[in-house]
């Protein structure tokens, strides 16, 4: 299984710990960014599986970056987790409206974030496996498997 690439953006010490955990304990390849504009530039250049963005990123907020990511045509759309100081209902609604896949309020438990990310990683792994299976099947076999045999042929 390939290493997932995670883009992490935030300046607080919690993000330093998060980057270290993502590299050392969770086994991800980590891209570090300092602001929302850097996040957008990195996503234009590189395939990223997961974006973990602080709501309060400088130059472009995590919310604005999330909206940009969903509006721009990228090769693949990453799974986006927005993190914020306050988990007010209007912030949660704004995050999901901007295209976030998940939302966590700070202070958050690293285990909660790891659960979100590892669940997504498992889904990616299953999709990769299904994709490999489908690419190795004979197209006629797919046709035969998915379509019922016509009645005229079933009597033969």
Regions found by a protein language model. Name each.
Residues 20, 64, 87-102:
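Alpha4 helix (beta4-alpha4-beta5 surface) of REC/receiver domains from two-component response regulators
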Residues 122-156:
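CheY-like receiver
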Residues 47-53, 57:
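Active-site beta3 strand of CheY-like receiver
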Residues 90, 108-117:
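C-terminal output helix
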Residues 13-31:
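Two-component/phosphorelay signaling modules centered on CheY-like receiver
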Residues 41, 63-76:
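Short amphipathic alpha-helix used as the core "switch/output" element in two-component signaling
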Residues 4, 35, 61-64:
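Acidic catalytic/metal-coordinating carboxylates
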């Amino acid at each position: 299984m390939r290493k997932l690439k995670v883009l992490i953006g935030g300046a607080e010490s919690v993000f330093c710990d998060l980057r270290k955990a993502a590299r050392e304990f969770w086994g991800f390849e980590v891209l570090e960014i300092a602001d929302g504009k850097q996040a957008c530039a990195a996503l234009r250049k590189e395939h990223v599986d997961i974006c973990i963005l602080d709501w309060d990123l400088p130059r472009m907020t995590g919310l604005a970056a999330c909206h940009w990511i969903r509006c721009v045509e990228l090769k693949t759309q990453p799974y986006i987790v927005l993190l914020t100081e306050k988990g007010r209902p209007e912030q949660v609604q704004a995050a999901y409206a901007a295209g976030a896949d998940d939302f966590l309020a700070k202070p958050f438990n690293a285990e909660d974030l790891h659960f979100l990310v590892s669940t997504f990683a498992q889904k990616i792994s299953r999709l990769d496996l299904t994709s490999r299976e489908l690419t190795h099947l004979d197209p006629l076999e797919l046709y035969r498997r998915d379509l019922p045999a016509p009645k005229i042929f079933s009597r033969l």
